[in-house]
Amino acid sequence: MEYVLVITIAIVAFSLVFDFINGFHDTANAIATAVSTRALTPRTAILLAAIMNFIGALTFTGVAGTITKDIVDPFKLQNGLVVVLAAIIAAIVWNLVTWLYGIPSSSSHALIGAIAGAAIAAQGFTVLHYQGFTKIIIVLIISPIIAFCVGFIMYTIVKIIFKNANLTRANRNFRFFQMFTAALQSFSHGTNDAQKSMGIITLALIVANLQDPSNVEPVLWVK
C-alpha cells in the first residue's frame, strides 16, 4: 500500500509539472497575436489566459474521461501505476525537448502516444482500447486539415468584407475582437489541454483502487 501511495503521489506531482510545461508551451499561442498587435499588454494577457483556462478546465470533463478510459483499458493494466508514471514523464521530456529546440508540437499527441507506448511496452497491443484509440488518432490527424480549411475560408471572408474599409478604424475594431478571441482561445485550451492531467490522475486513482472504477469523472480535488 505504501508503494502504491508513493507512485500515485509521484503521478500527481508529474501531472502538475506536465500542466505547467503545457502552459508555457501552448497557452502563449492563445494570447500571442493579441500581445503582438498591442490589443492587450503582456501582463493583462497572461492574467486573462490564466482566468479563462481555469474556467474552461472546470466547465467540461469530456477530455479527461477520454484520457482515462479510451486509450487503454484500466482494468487490464498490470503494473498500471508504473505505466502511467512512465507515460507522463515521457510526455514531459518530449515537450521540453521540442520547446528547447523551438519545434512546434502538440502536448496532446505527446501524452496520448506516451500512454499507448508505455502500455504496449508493459503488456502488449491487447491492452489498447482500439475503438477509442482509433477515434482519437483519426481526430489528431484530421484536426490540422480542418483547421487549415477553416482558416483559409475565414481569411477569404474577412478579406472580402473589409476590402474597402478604413484601415485605422478596421485595426481598432480588430484589436477589440482580438481581446475576445484571446479569451475564447484560452477558455478552449482549458476545456481541452488542462483536462489531460485530470484524466491521467483519475486513471492513476482507478488503477490504484483509490477511486470507484465505475466513475471516470475527475473528483473535485483533481479539478
Language-model-detected regions and their locations in the chain:
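Multi-pass alpha-helical transmembrane bundle typical of ion/small-solute transporters
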Residues: 1-223
